[in-house]
Amino acid sequence: MKSLLICLVLLELVWLGNGQSRDHQPLAPAFFVFGDSLVDSGNNNYIPTLARANYFPYGIDFGFPTGRFCNGRTVVDYGATYLGLPLVPPYLSPLSIGQNALRGVNYASAAAGILDETGRHYGARTTFNGQISQFEITIELRLRRFFQNPADLRKYLAKSIIGINIGSNDYINNYLMPERYSTSQTYSGEDYADLLIKTLSAQISRLYNLGARKMVLAGSGPLGCIPSQLSMVTGNNTSGCVTKINNMVSMFNSRLKDLANTLNTTLPGSFFVYQNVFDLFHDMVVNPSRYGLVVSNEACCGNGRYGGALTCLPLQQPCLDRNQYVFWDAFHPTETANKIIAHNTFSKSANYSYPISVYELAKL
């Protein structure tokens, strides 16, 4: 317990002391993050689940394990920095209580998906529906008291950036696991993508009704290129990825972009940005040298073929040249890869965000 308290104090110093410019006002008042292990900053540390990253070597370049599924920072950590905000504390952490919540809260939970059933074999996780409920609690019990009237709170929420990175687990921890889930027997690839988008649309409407207006929808990456999927097949195409899986994800992503367009015209006062993570990350895998990377088909910390048969274990020694790897473990990018993704999706010069960059969204 004592060591946990020490870690929490250290985390507070990091969150409050990093990421926010001292010379300039932030571009947005707050950054609220929803999603899965790609952006979880430690929520799963507080629940009974197998989906945890609270052990070394996770966090090796952060200073200590924080619960992030990475050697260092995630893409939303860098995203917060681009917005001029401190790193966003996890909802279940004591650090998200009080004035800290005014700069944003991270609700993301490893193994979570759009569908409530997704990831259930890991044990507890906060589904996307559950995360939205936590957002509602945040508004009512943690934020409302800081505003003199409801109009000020509505203005604050409307100016805040809402980041949504969800959907990957609905494939790798649901549809692509026929021994555990029936979705692949029930739905074709296209029908499943339709189901995900229909469900997601209703969830986004909940966020809108709670006051969210500026929302960033991150597309799923090329899941057919991650080490865990490569380790399970004997034949890959010339790009080094599993084409069938990438085609499934592309069905979801194309519909997600269409959803952003639709919501921009049907939800008054809202603005949606779609982040084309798939094409960016696929290019990083196929042309790593273009981004200063070297190894793009093997995990820095993993076991078996491509380091993807069994993910990074406690106290396992990771690769030493982590800044040359695209993948940290069997599923997740390295800090270096996350930094590249954030630059191309959050920064002023981002060229993988549609129809505008997150920087421009925040300035609206």
Curated annotation (Swiss-Prot):
GO terms under biological process: lipid catabolic process
Keyword set includes Secreted: yes
Active site (catalytic residues): 37, 329, 332
Signal peptide residues on this chain, from the entry's feature table: 1-19
Keywords from the named record: Glycoprotein, Hydrolase, Lipid degradation, Lipid metabolism, Secreted, Signal
Family annotation (SUPFAM superfamilies): SGNH hydrolase
Coiled coil: none
Enzyme class: hydrolase
Family matches, as InterPro entries: GDSL (IPR001087), GDSL_esterase/lipase (IPR051238), SGNH_hydro_sf (IPR036514), SGNH_plant_lipase-like (IPR035669)
GO cellular component: extracellular region
Subcellular localization: Secreted
Enzyme Commission number(s): 3.1.1.-
Chain positions carrying an annotated carbohydrate: 236-237, 264, 351
Molecular functions per Gene Ontology: lipase activity
Source superkingdom: Eukaryota
Main location: secreted
PANTHER family, per the entry: GDSL ESTERASE_LIPASE 7, GDSL-LIKE LIPASE/ACYLHYDROLASE-RELATED
Family: Belongs to the 'GDSL' lipolytic enzyme family.
Protein name: GDSL esterase/lipase 7
Organism: Arabidopsis thaliana
Gene that produces this protein: GLIP7
